[in-house]
């Protein structure tokens, strides 16, 4: 499976200016290509796909400002956004009730402040530096040490063993954020082998004071509780300082302090969720648990009613991010993950082997 190694580049970093320039050029190409696609779609009711746009823009200045492979990736991202819009729009016409609103056309990036992601494929990374464990995207002065294995291996090509370098690195992405950039090294990771038993189950109940409660179907194994109060504390501090700053700025304004506050909160929460998910997976490995059941409800944040204060704490905690971390870390070690609805778990007894029903949506009749 594919994993991501992340490097945070702040404004005082030596690579910041060059990355900012590249993301600005990417924005220019994205906006120009998006303009052409939108005009055709709105006025001619036709869709210009990637191949059509790429052929049109090959000689254009914004396209030539970056390496060809990088410009192609920008157009591919735009093409995926339009395909997603078309599919969503079709689904909306068939069943509007499944959506919270009508899908919008892919929009433009801000002319001055806007930045767009820059993607370098494995072919656009300099091989000489790559062999030494250094990522150097083509035609840049960015030299980044990576922990990913960059040793050369032989690859199977159409059944024949060819002497070609088989790198685990697939892409390098320059991702713009609020006031910093993230260099993402996307690589292929092999599944680790452990002696696990698929009939040994563990289930996770996600909550507020207890972020996760891990229970087992094997007698004698104590449940594992992951404390959720540190996340509540992070959110409470964030909400308090944010309200103070916004009272000075006005509701629709932002500031450098506010952006730093948002980044600090995000980094702290991600760090805590990574550590919590790693502890859970390590516990499953030690107990030889082969199957993990995760309770999850669709739209649980939109429909929850725990009171004003609890609602604020619950909604601000990114539970889906925790579930994603658990899922990919479980897959990495060969643990099977099963998702189940939680609507009726409180009415069913595990000790009595009660089934957990799943009901279709319908109108309540009094």
Model-derived segments and their meaning:
Residues 1-366:
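Nucleic-acid substrate recognition interfaces
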């Amino acid at each position: 499976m594919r994993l991501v190694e992340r490097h945070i580049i702040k404004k005082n970093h030596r690579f910041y200016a060059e990355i900012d320039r590249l993301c600005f050029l990417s924005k220019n190409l994205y906006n120009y290509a998006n303009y052409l696609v939108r005009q055709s779609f709105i006025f001619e009711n036709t869709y210009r796909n990637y191949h059509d746009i790429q052929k049109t823009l090959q000689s254009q200045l914004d396209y030539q400002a970056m390496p060809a492979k990088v410009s192609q990736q920008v157009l591919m991202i735009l093409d995926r956004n339009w395909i997603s819009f078309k599919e969503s729009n079709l689904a909306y016409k068939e069943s509007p009730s499944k959506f919270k609103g009508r899908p919008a056309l892919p929009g433009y990036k801000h002319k001055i402040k806007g930045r767009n992601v820059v993607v370098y494929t494995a072919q656009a990374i300099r091989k000489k530096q790559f062999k030494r464990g250094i990522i150097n995207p083509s035609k840049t002065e960015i030299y980044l040490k990576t922990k990913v294995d960059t040793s050369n291996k032989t690859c199977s090509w159409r059944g024949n063993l060819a002497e070609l370098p088989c790198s685990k690195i697939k892409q390098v992405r320059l991702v713009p954020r609020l006031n910093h950039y993230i260099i993402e090294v996307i690589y292929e990771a092999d599944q680790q082998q452990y002696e696990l038993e698929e009939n040994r189950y563990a289930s996770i109940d996600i909550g507020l004071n207890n972020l996760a409660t891990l229970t087992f179907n094997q007698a004698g194994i104590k449940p594992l509780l992951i404390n959720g109060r540190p996340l509540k504390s992070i959110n409470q501090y964030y909400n308090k300082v944010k309200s103070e700053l916004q009272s000075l700025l006005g509701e629709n304004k932002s500031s450098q302090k506010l952006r730093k506050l948002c980044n600090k909160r995000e980094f702290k929460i991600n760090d805590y969720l990574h550590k919590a998910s790693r502890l859970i997976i390590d516990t499953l490995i030690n107990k030889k648990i082969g199957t993990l059941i995760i309770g999850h409800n669709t739209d649980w944040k939109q429909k929850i009613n725990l009171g004003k204060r609890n609602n604020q704490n619950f909604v601000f905690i990114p539970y889906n991010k925790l579930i994603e971390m658990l899922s990919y870390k479980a897959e990495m070690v060969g643990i099977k993950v099963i998702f189940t609805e939680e609507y009726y778990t409180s009415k069913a007894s595990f000790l009595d082997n009660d089934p957990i029903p799943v009901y279709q949506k319908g109108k309540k009749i009094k």
